[in-house]
Amino acid sequence: MNSHPYLDPEPELPFSSGAGDALSATSTSASQPFRGWNRGRILGQKRALKPREVWAIRVRLHIARKLRDLALFNLAIDSKLRGCELRIVDIIQGGAIRTRTGVIQQKTGAKVQFEITEQSREAVKTWVAKANLGRDDWLFPSRNGREKHLTTRQYARLVGEWIEGIGLPVKEYGTHSMRRTKASLIYRKTGNLRAVQLLLGHT
């Protein structure tokens, strides 16, 4: 059987993200087997995207003119954060898109610094102009009103669409894949585990 073009083996980061593998379901009795909540689900670490998969998603979003999604995807890779929680002021200063910035993680309260690549800056510039966003707006506002940002549930759905769009199994990838992708690429290029740990906020 031919292997899927996107599913050839890849090295994993040599440390855990903290999520364990699913435990097998057990039975409470011979007549009434217990069905675990996680039966049939793939749990644990989500896979990082490979360079060609990142490229494939970018190309599809560009061709489809999905300006918001392209900016959101690029920033998710760069920042290793949920891009839906970014504000204009986090990214733009004095009318120019920053090359490097830092934001406070809502979940942990820790400050995360990251570089914004040229292709991300171009995507953000195009999206901000198209959406006519102001300094105090969310970078990716909810369609229900600019006072709210795109929800994490909506973001997860979009990630699923991007993954499915290039033929990858959605169950093996998720929003955490965005976080792990840049770290995985840096580790494969440098082999510097400590740098990757710091990049992901591990002390």
Question: Predicted regions: what is each one?
Answer:
Residues 1-203:
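Conserved catalytic core of the tyrosine transesterase superfamily
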